[in-house]
Amino acid sequence: MDKATELQNAYQAYWDALGTQEAPRQEEFNEAYKGVYSSFEEFVNDNSLIDELTAGWPEEAKTYFDRDAYIRDLQLDYLVAEGEEEAYGVRYSVVYVFDEN
């Protein structure tokens, strides 16, 4: 999938997720769009969000950290829209991630 197609699909997913009649401004979309991922967990891992949070923690404390619960709760801070992409004739599920600000 090329970048232009990804952005078109992401823009449509953003508009659908907002649930508005009026199309979002391009600047608004550009600021909000964080990327397309196979899952929200992949977004968290690719952006080192947990590593940043736990930096400086003792290793023992990290063993008690509930990654799954944190990822589930963190998803509430983002607008996550499910979609499908296609590459080489194969369709697969993706998530588009947007800031909710």
Model-found features: residue ranges?
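Acidic interaction surfaces
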Residues: M1-N101
